[in-house]
Amino acid sequence: TNTPEQQCYLQAKCYIEFYVVV
């Protein structure tokens, strides 16, 4: 079961967004 967070973690695009959110 892959959670959206994990998938986002793999994607650089989402990674940047996640980084900004933190």
Curated annotation (Swiss-Prot):
Domain of life of the source: Eukaryota
Main localization, broad class: secreted
Residues annotated as domain Peptidase M12B: 14-22
GO BP: any one term: proteolysis
TM region positions: none
Location of the protein in the cell: Secreted
One Gene Ontology term, aspect cellular component: extracellular region
Reported tissue expression: Expressed by the venom gland.
Cofactor note: Binds 1 zinc ion per subunit.
Keywords for the protein's UniProt record, in alphabetical order: Cell adhesion impairing toxin, Complement system impairing toxin, Disulfide bond, Glycoprotein, Hydrolase, Metal-binding, Metalloprotease, Protease, Secreted, Toxin, Zinc
GO molecular function: metal ion binding; metallopeptidase activity; toxin activity
Modification(s) after translation: N-glycosylated.
EC number: 3.4.24.-
Function text: Snake venom metalloproteinase that inhibits the classical complement pathway dose-dependently. It acts by binding to carbohydrates of IgG within the antibody-sensitized sheep erythrocytes (EA) complex, and thus prevents interaction of component C2 with immobilized C4b. Also induces cation-independent hemagglutination that can be prevented by D-galactose pretreatment.
Subunit structure: Heterotrimer; disulfide-linked. The heterotrimer consists of 1 metalloproteinase chain and 2 lectin chains.
Family of this protein: Belongs to the venom metalloproteinase (M12B) family. P-III subfamily. P-IIId sub-subfamily.
Miscellaneous section: Negative results: does not show proteolytic activity on rabbit IgG, human C3 and C4 complement components, fibrinogen, beta-casein, hemoglobin, ferritin, myoglobin, chymotrypsinogen, and melittin.
Protein name stated in the entry: Zinc metalloproteinase oxiagin
Source species of the chain: Naja oxiana (Central Asian cobra)
